[in-house]
Amino acid sequence: SPKPEWVEGLNRMDMNIVPSTFTKNVFQNCVYDRMDENTKQKVGELRMTKPMEVLFEGADLNIYKKTKEFSKELVDEMEKIPEKFTFLYTGHWLQGDLGQDRKDTGMLLKVFLETFKNKKNPPALIMKTSGATFSVIDRNEIMNKIQDIKKTVTGNLPNIYFLHGDLLDEEMNEMYNHPKVKAHITFTHGEGFGRPLLEATLSEKPVLASAWSGHVDFLHQDKAILL
């Protein structure tokens, strides 16, 4: 839920703009009791009183679209992956212990490993992720997180492919569309919008995502698997 100071900040604005109807509803439905510091009795309520409008971010349809054209660099890299079925995760790995980071990246990795361990011909997971930067230090920290989670799962584990660094929009669209990428997946539970999920849908491949957050504005049960 939004913090009380966030609601107070919104009420200092003439107009508030958010990227999704989901986000707008969260703020509109958020109500806090105002308590008297001495009597500890309720003396009122804190809620958003200023206008809020939704500005849908959208995606560039000239870039994000279904395609069968791929750069030689991507083709060469993807040939190094023996699996013909991979899930793609695109998103930051934010602060917080397992199950507590906003995008739930660590839990996605753990559940994937637990689900497909000891399976014959398991799928792989491609993780296009980073922390705060694209530095070598950040890359090493993410690699350590992956290894730490792998140590908690016993058995013959499926492969994890870690992709770190900034890609052009056109390169990301090629990733979404590559034939080895069969579906896009995320456990996120804190999206204001969820741009990578929208971009991924434009490849016309399945998207598996949580049924809570800004992306429910454009991900529907008939075109996505909402967990």
Task: Report residues per predicted region.
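Short glycine/serine-rich donor-binding loops of glycosyltransferases
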Residues: 194-197, 212
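Donor nucleotide-sugar binding/catalytic pocket of nucleotide-sugar-dependent glycosyltransferases
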Residues: 15-73
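Short hydrophobic beta-strand element within catalytic cores of glycosyltransferases
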Residues: 206-209, 225-226
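Conserved catalytic-core segment of nucleotide-activated headgroup transferases in glycan assembly
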Residues: 61-174
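A conserved, positively charged/aromatic
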Residues: 7-14
